[in-house]
Amino acid sequence: MAVEMLYEADVKVAALDGKKIAVIGYGSQGHAHAQNLRDSGHDVIIGVRHGKSFDKAKEDGFDTYEVGEATKLADIIMVLAPDEIQKDIYKDEIAPNLSAGKALGFAHGFNIHFGYIKAPEDVDVFMVAPKGPGHLVRRTYTEGFGVPSLYAVYQNPTGNAENIALDWAKGIGSARVGLLVTTFKEETEEDLFGEQAVLMGGLTHLIEAGFEVLTEAGYAPQLAYFEVLHEMKLIVDLIYEGGFKKMRQSCSNTAEFGDFVTGPRVIGPEVKENMKAALADIQSGKFAREFVEDHDAGFPRLKAFRKEAEGLEIEKIGAELRKAMPFVNQNDDDAFKIYN
């Protein structure tokens, strides 16, 4: 079902005016939301545990508190800590300091949708989910536009939750480029599916498989890297700018013919069935349970996955080749880190 895109002219609310806003967490999304809202004229404080993020928030000029104290002081509390620690932060520091009429916000529906956080019935619960990482939310705001966002309301005892969500999205710059209404269920399940089946899980394993096929057939690993990984950005940029049509128009007839002939052989019906199974695991809560259980055990599976991935030949080859390509390594890695 199609939904209508909203823009700044459609957001005729001032629900954040006169309110004290606490951004909980000062990592990838936290720093962007906080700085954009402050630059939009809103009263923002930071709630975060003592450590690197606490120091960084103070350095950036914010009044910074422990999470519980920030929750007490604020009218609107936006939880932007990593998914896996939100439930503990909420139970230990946020919940004891919530009171009727306050609003609780999220940028991803994971903990609310799967029931790891259960807000009191007299507290508004809303979501504003930018469709991009925090450094882009901040950078595009400073450049005069923004990143599109989804917004949703989970519960609305005050009758003002939707206005808060819309004004928040406007304050971080998203209304400049477009807002789409959703639900916590829809955002959570679609976001997880996109990450797992296409954007990360699907893409990285497709690249890895292509690299292995070429190198196992005797082709030079350096050439294989360029063919299946390095050129990926060039293709994705074209798709990003103008869809499949622009990408195909920008490539040779040989490449386009091969796309149509071989693509369905590689990504056949069985892949779609596997995707459906992955979606079912997300919808049932199976993936969420596995993720939370792994976190609670100290992330043994995630750490093992990371160690295995670090040993891949394509990663070693890529690290060497990128040393000779400074143009692909100019970003500040610190902008991509997520601090708890």
Swiss-Prot record:
UniProt-listed SUPFAM superfamilies: 6-phosphogluconate dehydrogenase C-terminal domain-like (SSF48179), NAD(P)-binding Rossmann-fold domains (SSF51735)
Highest taxon listed in the record's lineage: Bacteria
Short name of any one Pfam family annotated for the protein: KARI_C
One GO location term (cellular component): cytosol
Positions that bind substrate: 252
Cofactor binding note: Binds 2 magnesium ions per subunit.
Residues given in the record as NADP(+) binding sites: 26-29, 49, 53, 83-86, 134
Binding site for Mg(2+) 2: 191, 227, 231
MF annotations from Gene Ontology: ketol-acid reductoisomerase activity; magnesium ion binding; NADP binding
Active-site residue list: 108
Domain KARI N-terminal Rossmann: residue ranges: 3-182
Cofactor(s) needed for function: Mg(2+)
Family to which the UniProt record says this protein belongs: Belongs to the ketol-acid reductoisomerase family.
HAMAP family: IlvC (MF_00435)
Its biological purpose: Involved in the biosynthesis of branched-chain amino acids (BCAA). Catalyzes an alkyl-migration followed by a ketol-acid reduction of (S)-2-acetolactate (S2AL) to yield (R)-2,3-dihydroxy-isovalerate. In the isomerase reaction, S2AL is rearranged via a Mg-dependent methyl migration to produce 3-hydroxy-3-methyl-2-ketobutyrate (HMKB). In the reductase reaction, this 2-ketoacid undergoes a metal-dependent reduction by NADPH to yield (R)-2,3-dihydroxy-isovalerate.
Name this protein carries in UniProt: Ketol-acid reductoisomerase (NADP(+))
Native organism taxonomy: Bacteria, Bacillati, Bacillota, Bacilli, Lactobacillales
Gene from which the chain derives: ilvC
